[in-house]
């Protein structure tokens, strides 16, 4: 029987372009089921808050950026009463600007920040990568 996984592995190596995708997490949001699934219950509901870094030979790209550092420092000051319903739980060390350094990326070298949408839990990179071009969705 032929090993199909071996063929996939060989093609991956053959077509390696130097592009790498990293997934990180900036904590989670604690809420209730009713706020996620249209009034379906009072049970607790926790949502992980991921974000992504693409290391590319032509420049690194951040997608979203997770929660902003302010969510870890003073969530009520930054999010106001939204934090009473969607409680951001985040450590300072989970901030995207610090996490990129763990994979040898200099925040000043990030070329683009792509915003899939501008909810509070996707805005962690905004304003913290000064040399990046920020690219929001047109609808935003």
Give the role of each language-model region:
Residues 1-17, 35-38:
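C-terminal regulatory/interaction regions
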Residues 22-24, 61, 114, 135:
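Hydrophobic/aromatic beta-strand patches that form the interior of the parallel beta-sheet core
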């Amino acid at each position: 029987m032929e090993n199909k996984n071996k063929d996939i592995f060989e093609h991956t190596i053959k077509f390696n372009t130097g592009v790498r995708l990293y997934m990180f997490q900036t904590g989670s949001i604690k809420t209730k089921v009713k706020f996620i699934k249209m009034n379906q219950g009072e049970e607790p509901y926790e949502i992980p808050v991921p974000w992504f870094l693409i290391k590319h030979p032509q420049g690194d790209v951040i997608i979203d950026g997770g929660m902003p550092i302010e969510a870890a420092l003073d969530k009520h000051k930054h999010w106001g009463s939204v934090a009473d319903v969607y409680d951001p739980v985040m450590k300072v060390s989970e901030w995207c600007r610090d996490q990129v350094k763990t994979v040898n990326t200099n925040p000043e070298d990030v070329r683009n920040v792509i915003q899939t949408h501008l909810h509070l839990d996707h805005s962690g990179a905004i304003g913290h990568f000064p040399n990046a071009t920020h690219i929001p969705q047109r609808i935003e």
